[in-house]
Amino acid sequence: MFRSIDGGKNWKNVLDINKWTGVTDIVIDKNDPNILYAATWQRHRNVAAYMGGGPGSSIYKSIDSGISWFKIDVGLPESNLGKIGVAISPCDSSIIYAAIETDRRNGGVYKTTNSGGSWVKMSDTVSGATGPHY
């Protein structure tokens, strides 16, 4: 993920996982704009295969307006994650939801009530079996 502080004139890469991983979702805490959450997705597609997830997929948090990032994955599945959608509760910004695509045993909707300190699985289902739908 790239960040600009001068209206887009200059950019700095602030969250670089690997060449197969990008940021697919980012949300900002409306009560504290220094706090951001980003979902990364590792995928690899070539003529022989499509891998919908990998070790680069995760959720990250910044507490300094996106200058630095750290992974917040306690309680999330340990298998390779697929695409992730993230939402902050409009009533309480310490509550965050993550819809995570992965295998049927581990994928689903996860919730944190402590700003990403730990996650609890709330649902076994995200969407149909035809790919990410967030």
Task: Enumerate the predicted regions with their spans.
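Beta-propeller blade termini and top-face loops
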Residues: 1-134
